[in-house]
Amino acid sequence: MECNLVNLSNDNVGTAQLNPLIFSAKQKLSILHDIVRWQLAKRRAGTHKTKGISDVSGTTAKPYGQKRTGRARQGSLRSPQFRGGGIIFGPVVRSHTYSLNKKVRKFGLKIALSLKYLNNQVIILDNLNIDVKKTSEMCKCIKNFKFSSFLIVGDYGDDLLRAAKNLHYVDLIKPIGLNVFDILNHECVMLTKDTLKHLEGRLL
């Protein structure tokens, strides 16, 4: 598979070869759904907590005798039926992460890249070695591409990162950090030639 090779100014500088095993994978949206749920679950802090009957401060004394009052028997004022009592089966601090097979995660990355390629939303860059230090300069470069949001994947320098940091529609990521959620969350995915080699070693 052959596609145009461009620079950040959208000037054609040659052609690049795309591996069909990565960019022509069979579309299974259910796998993308599973992977996105898995990624979002990993991001959850899990710091939710309510106080149960053992956490609520208060007396441990039995409020009144078991018999002869005519009222329902009670053993603690910290019980959930009382005002200020504990919460039954409330959330506790825990991890929301769960395991997902490596093969499924690899296949999901192929599906996401193939989906973007089918929709003409993949751009191959020759490199990220461009003399851009200001946000205004980066904005001019990005305006050459007619998309609403960009995920730039490659080995970028500090100057490029600083120039793009204040653009909410541009995100930079290293090849090792490429993931399904970020791919689907941006309209256009920009990959460098070195990133293509990294993907072949990672996914094949």
Swiss-Prot record:
GO-annotated molecular function: rRNA binding; structural constituent of ribosome
Keyword Magnesium: no
InterPro entries associated with the record: Ribosomal_uL4, Ribosomal_uL4-like, Ribosomal_uL4_dom_sf
One matching Pfam family: Ribosomal_L4
Keywords: Ribonucleoprotein, Ribosomal protein, RNA-binding, rRNA-binding
Family: Belongs to the universal ribosomal protein uL4 family.
Protein name: Large ribosomal subunit protein uL4
Organism annotation: Wolbachia sp. subsp. Drosophila simulans (strain wRi)
